[in-house]
Amino acid sequence: MRSMFDQQLKTLNEEMLYMGGLCEDTIQQTIEALMSGDVKKAHALNNMMSQLTQQERSIENICLKLLMQ
């Protein structure tokens, strides 16, 4: 059981790192869209924000599973 818990913690860590990368990309793209005034690029950020929201939910689910054990 302990090894399963450790594996879930490892998965949580990997998901958090992935989300951190998504945040970095989103911030960079936002800055570029603002600096260039590129409306298309700004609209494309909605997709990135959706990915972040989905990743957040995934992380929340992992955390809930860990807490319920």
Model-inferred region functions:
Residues 1-69:
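Cytosolic, long alpha-helical scaffolding segments
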